[in-house]
Amino acid sequence: EITLIGEDSSVAGLEVGQKLTAKQLLYAMLLPSGNDAAYTIAVASARKFKENDKLPAKEAIEVFAELMNDAATELGAEHSHFTNPDGFHDKNHYTTALDMVKIASYAKSIPLISEICGTYQITQKLKSGEEFYWVNSNKLLNQGEDCYSEYADGMKTGFTDEAGSCVISSFTKNGKTMLTVAMNSPELYGKYYDTLILAKLGFKQNKIDCSY
């Protein structure tokens, strides 16, 4: 399934034959934006859903896309449609900022996902023996960056030529969590500075002091 990823995809460096736990696959997908991990998770999930370990990878991706769309509908993401697990451009693959917030809000409520998305870096030894070091692509979590925020604790970056540079972020202070979405930024860092402005406005409206 990792051979199905698009050209120039961001990857976690996985290879055929390696063995990972489900949690390691999530780290590989969510920290370095590993599309190889995303496809592996998608195929495994679809095969389990269909109770068919021999389901061809391409068919499994179609099944997983259906599952994604069903889940999105249940979450109220009515203006989204997904065709693949990694967000690669497709005319039938689309979403909105509001729908992304709805999906991210649910993801944030899952402790494991929240923990992983808020992790800046991690070293993992696979079940097959290989060792990997993954760094989160979200620069809001990097203390060495000007856009770093001590309140940032997620969630996910994204990029395609068509969608531009995007990020959905979470900030937590005084027990309150704020989700923001920045899309189609023409510059890599532009989305982060826009995000910081949005977070400040959000916390201000909720009367929570938040200075960076």
How does the language model describe each region?
Residues 1, 30, 206-207:
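Short, flexible coil/linker elements and helix-boundary hinge sites characteristic
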Residues 1-3, 100:
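Active-site SXXK
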Residues 5-42, 131-147, 152:
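Conserved catalytic neighborhood of penicillin-recognizing serine enzymes
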